[in-house]
A protein has these predicted regions:
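Nucleotide/pyrophosphate-binding catalytic subdomain
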Residues: 1-131
Length: 133
């Protein structure tokens, strides 16, 4: 029987957490559908990526510059990608597109969903890298 597994934000907040999740998924071949959350808090004072994205939405909606906020969010993802040693993987184009869409036509649902979308891309690349080792 095929299984759906969902991992919350704290389970996917860092590269180390991703590695634990990868091991959990790999340990059972029936775990074929993976539903990732956006990165959560890495430590108590940290901010969840979804909260960061919702703040970006508010900033964009007000017509203000979102460049620095988007850089901070991208840095979170880049830290995970580097920690997972995904050498040929990048979210640069995704961040360009997300930034453009939020500047041109800010939509709260779109902003809130990008964290899961991006973490899903990282998870897929990471799981594929485990197969190719």
């Amino acid at each position: 029987m095929k299984k759906v597994v969902k991992f919350g934000g704290s389970s996917l907040a860092s590269a180390e957490q991703f590695k634990k999740v990868g091991a959990i998924i790999s340990a059972d071949e029936s775990r074929v559908y993976v539903v990732p959350s956006a990165p959560g808090k890495r430590f108590p004072e940290d901010t969840k990526v979804t909260d960061m994205l919702l703040h970006v939405y508010e900033t964009a909606k007000a017509g203000e510059d979102i460049t620095e906020e988007m850089k901070a969010i991208k840095a979170r993802y880049d830290e995970i990608i580097t920690g997972l040693a995904l050498k040929d993987f990048s979210l640069d184009k995704d961040f360009e597109e997300i930034t453009k869409k939020l500047v041109e036509n800010p939509q709260v649902d779109y902003a809130a969903s990008r964290g899961e979308f991006l973490n899903g891309k990282i998870m897929a690349a990471y799981l594929l890298s485990l197969i190719h080792i």
